[in-house]
Amino acid sequence: MSRRVLLLEPNYKNKFPPIGLMKLATYFRLRGDDVVFYKGDLKEFVIHQITEECVAKLSYLDGSINWKLRSDKIALYIRYRKHEYLKQVGIEDSEIAPILEPWVEYYKKFYHSGEYKKYPRWDWVGVTTLFTFYWDITIETIEFAKLMVKDTKNIMVGGVMASIQPDEIEKATGIRPHIGTLHTPHKDIDKDNPYIIDELPLDYSILDEIDYVYPDSGAYYSYSTRGCIRKCS
């Protein structure tokens, strides 16, 4: 059975794309899992997910209308709760409008009441980290990941800051980060994992899933060395 996998990069400005998450995307897709990458406003991500569920429900109840084309208007109503946005959705175009409108109201309340926090949708969530001066936004993203995943045992926090300050991150979030690279088959992530994840090719396609544009996103990346060659004590 395929897993729903969410890969998160905190919404800080950075020049290079998240190479670690790109390798994880390759790994999970090799395993047949569904992978989503996100970098941006976390509230917008939640609204987008709830809007997708609302569109799916409306499409199931009345397939004669392409509700996906109206998803932007649905998202605006869910976010702002203004009746003018509900009118723009055009529920009255459906012959079963009295049945559909309560469902739109349901998803609006589902978001604003915080009810969605009780029903996490993701089987596995990975969070990358970078510099320590991005501490606050990184911790915020990890806390968000805890709300999104069905079991917090299936959260992996990795990257530079995670390897430098694992104890501090664990104290702040309760999540023990992964230190270093993923280089151990039959241990990293899954016991039946046959791959050295750190050596997998990068999945550049995940960069097309977000609005953020990395200045060097058009480049291809390789490693010549790992870490520092010095032996400082």
What do these predicted ranges mean?
Residues L30, I74, I137:
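RNA-binding accessory domains that recognize and position tRNA/RNA substrates
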Residues N11-N14, N66, N154, N193:
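Detector for Asparagine
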Residues D62-K82, K87:
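Aromatic- and Gly/Pro-rich amphipathic surface segment
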